[in-house]
Structures are given as structure tokens and as C-alpha cells.
Amino acid sequence: MSEQIVTPESSTPVVSNNEAKINLLDLNRQQMREFFKNLGEKPFRADQVMKWMYHYCCDNFDEMTDINKVLRGKLKEVAEIRAPEVVEEQRSSDGTIKWAIAVGDQRVETVYIPEDDRATLCVSSQVGCALECKFCSTAQQGFNRNLRVSEIIGQVWRAAKIVGAAKVTGQRPITNVVMMGMGEPLLNLTNVVPAMEIMLDDFGFGLSKRRVTLSTSGVVPALDKLGDMIDVALAISLHAPNDAIRDEIVPINKKYNIETFLGAVRRYLEKSNANQGRVTIEYVMLDHVNDGTEHAHQLAELLKETPCKINLIPWNPFPGAPYGRSSNSRIDRFSKVLMSYGFTTIVRKTRGDDIDAACGQLAGDVIDRTKRTLRKRMQGEAIDIKAI
């Protein structure tokens, strides 16, 4: 019997916390146009309002000066623009910023990573995570629910507003978004896809599809479905050169093994233009677990039929974790083996680890409503794609 991952409580509500009003951040452009049509307005009004919402991070209808007063008044009666609030901010010595963002009575974490030529925002898709990857802090928090569209795109909106207001400090505007925060995005397709549509929309944030990246641990039915819904860059959390190791550290592999996963990746690449023909492989380096030169040779053989570049990620510790970080010398030897096979191989620079904002360290504040035994069934049995 298959398990349903998306529950009734986690599907996208049309109505916000204020039961009388629709949160416009929950609507992509098609839905926004339908909303205005139902108000008796022309569809172009949706474009106007979205431009104010996303180009100027405006949440006040009275400031939308190219909208007539009558319509502004009507909008105030039936709608609102409500992004989740930042309740805590931490700044790293390397410029990385981590925001704890309130979603109801819980928190998720969003990370802003500035670089010389760009700024990347790492966005969460769920409150917690059900997949229990052993090396990841988020997985140890359990799982509560999927984020709504407004809570996903609202992270980008809130970050853009903060960075935009701080232009005098020299902070770089957001150029890239990665769905690599808390949660497994493919277990929340219903809400993740509309949020990414807004990121790509010219009346939304207007990002290139090559600058919006979704990372997955391998929910194969949902990955096949994603390719028919939207085209964005794809990264996969592989982390092991064989099924024996991956079964242990990424338990969903017991249901969708590496061969099955990579087959779905290749099918996605056939449909995608955003990836320019290759996928990004994420590989966390765990000391004497998956980081030997024999593992590097196995990985190279495993990936020879999958066009890719490989990101080696030094593991970032968290309390109670059973692993150690690979030494620089082991990472260097591993990298050289991969490059000898002709793979583009990058050792990811750790950012924000002094504020627990680095890869695998995001935890938030999660009320775990998914029992551990249920989570194990979710990993060991078929996932109902109709529920995704």
C-alpha cells in the first residue's frame, strides 16, 4: 500500500490567515488573472499588481499608483499581500545571512549567500523533512507540513525587500534561487512549482530558468512529473557511489535506487533546456564513509552515462551527528580521481558555517507530527504521486 506524502493540511489554501482575504502571494500569474477576472476586472490588472508586488516588494495597495482608487479599495476588502515575517537574523563573518522565518507557530530558515558576481538565496520548501538523510540536521527535526506558495515565494519576497532596503551597504540583489533549504521540494510539487513560476515570471522576480535550481534526494515519480510542469536547473543529492552506502545515509534509496534515480535524471535532461544538457551532482564528503579513492572510481563509473558536473561538499557538523568531515587531503585525492575521468569537479566552499547556515545545518523550529515509524514506511513503500 502506498503512502500519501501531501496531506489535506499541507495543500495550498486559497485563503490566508485572515479568513476573509486571499493572500495574493499564493497566486501565480494565471491564477492572478483569474482572480481579477472574477472581480470583473481586465486580466492586465494582474500584471500591474504583480509588478508592484515583486519588482518593488510592495505590500500596500495604496502605494500602487497606476491602479485606480476604486479597484484599490476593492482589493483591500478581499485580498492582502502577506509574506512570512523574519523573527531572527544571523550574519556570518563571510557575509552570509541566515533568517529564521515564522510560518505559523514554527520556523523555517532561509539563507542569503553573496559572492563577487552574484547572490544566491537558499529557500525552504517544507517545515522539517521526512526523508531522514543521516548527515543532515533538518532531517533530525522530523516533519510537520509542506509550505504554501506564499510561504515559499514569501521567503524570496522578504529577502529581496531586506536586501533592496540595504542597497547603501553594498549588498548584491538576489540573482539565483536554490530550492536547497529545509525539506524535499519534490514532495511539495503542488506549491513549489507555482512558486518557481513566480520566480521565473517577468512580472514576478524575472529570474532565468538557469538561475533557479531545484535539488532532490530522488523522489522518482515526482521528478518525472516535474519535467512536464516546469523547466529549471536540476541538482541531485547523490552522496554515495553505490546502493549499499546510499541505503544507509539516504534511506529513500531503498525505494528508488541509484539506477532508477539516474534514469529519471536522464529523462529530465532530455526535456530540459535550463540544464544545458547536464545535471549537478551533490556529494557530501563523510570521513571514511564515502570519501576513499575507491569510492571516487566507483562514482566515476556510475556517472559515465549521465552528463554532469560534480560538487564535492565538505560535511558540516551538527550536534549528535555520527560522522566526521573528510580531511582536505582526502577530498583533494577524491577530486583528482574524478578529474582524471574528465568530470568537471568543484569543491564547494563552505559558507555560513559559523551561524549554522551551511549545507546540511538548517534546522528551524519544527513540531514533528510525523511519527518515526510512519517516516520509515514513507521511505520503504511506494509514494503516491497523485498526492504530490
From Swiss-Prot:
The keyword Metal-binding applies. Its main location: cytoplasm. S-adenosyl-L-methionine binds at residues 183-184, 215, 237-239, 316. Its cofactor is [4Fe-4S] cluster. It is found in: Cytoplasm. PROSITE patterns: RADICAL_SAM. GO terms for molecular function: 4 iron, 4 sulfur cluster binding; metal ion binding; rRNA (adenine(2503)-C2-)-methyltransferase activity; rRNA binding; tRNA (adenine(37)-C2)-methyltransferase activity; tRNA binding. Residues 115-354 form the Radical SAM core domain. Its EC number is 2.1.1.192. The active site is at residues 109, 359. Pfam families: Radical_SAM, RlmN_N. SUPFAM superfamilies: Radical SAM enzymes (SSF102114). GO terms for cellular component: cytoplasm. Keywords: 4Fe-4S, Cytoplasm, Disulfide bond, Iron, Iron-sulfur, Metal-binding, Methyltransferase, rRNA processing, S-adenosyl-L-methionine, Transferase, tRNA processing. [4Fe-4S] cluster binds at residues 129, 133, 136. Disulfide bonds join 122-359. Specifically methylates position 2 of adenine 2503 in 23S rRNA and position 2 of adenine 37 in tRNAs. m2A2503 modification seems to play a crucial role in the proofreading step occurring at the peptidyl transferase center and thus would serve to optimize ribosomal fidelity. Reaction proceeds by a ping-pong mechanism involving intermediate methylation of a conserved cysteine residue. HAMAP family: RNA_methyltr_RlmN. Belongs to the radical SAM superfamily. RlmN family. This is Dual-specificity RNA methyltransferase RlmN. It comes from Salmonella arizonae (strain ATCC BAA-731 / CDC346-86 / RSK2980). The gene is rlmN.
